[in-house]
Amino acid sequence: MATSSAVLFLLLAVFAAGASAATFRITNNCGFTVWPAGIPVGGGFQLNSKQSSNINVPAGTSAGRIWGRTGCSFNNGRGSCATGDCAGALSCTLSGQPATLAEYTIGGSQDFYDISVIDGFNLAMDFSCSTGVALKCRDANCPDAYHHPNDVATHACNGNSNYQITFCP
């Protein structure tokens, strides 16, 4: 058993050594305030029109999601949003509906990313990585997005890449 644990630890250490954190640059080009949210990294914050902010995502993060919430009102971290609400919390621990989702996994030599409208569409979004394809989603029928769980809209990106998410591009 000790040998199995040592091998597993060594494999994880090698995987982690090849991966590094990714920076997600989030830009709000909408004519109104958007409240970006993210799980498991990012929580939630206010992003006024024409502003940008960065989120640092550690290597090894999988099943990550970032989305924009609209029509929000918060007081001491509690409130509500017209779209993308996550149980009335400013800092989200679950995703809200309806929302256009930027989904990602930050791996070792390769990352994966996509846009999903499975849970609904609320904001036009561009999502790109520094070494991959720019995904564009302007409406609920956008061809670059997942529309049902069996879609094949996931894209690969070189590991150690950074990302750009733009609301209302």
UniProtKB/Swiss-Prot annotation:
Coiled coil: none annotated. Keywords: Antimicrobial, Fungicide, Pathogenesis-related protein, Plant defense, Signal. PROSITE patterns: THAUMATIN_1, THAUMATIN_2. One of its GO terms (biological process) is defense response to fungus. Disulfide bonds: none annotated. It comes from the Eukaryota. InterPro entries: Osmotin/thaumatin-like_sf (IPR037176), Thaumatin (IPR001938), Thaumatin_CS (IPR017949). CDD domains: TLP-P. The keyword Signal applies. Residues 1-21 form the signal peptide. Belongs to the thaumatin family. PANTHER family: OS03G0233200 PROTEIN. Associated with resistance against stem rust fungi. This is Thaumatin-like pathogenesis-related protein 1. The gene is RASTL-1.
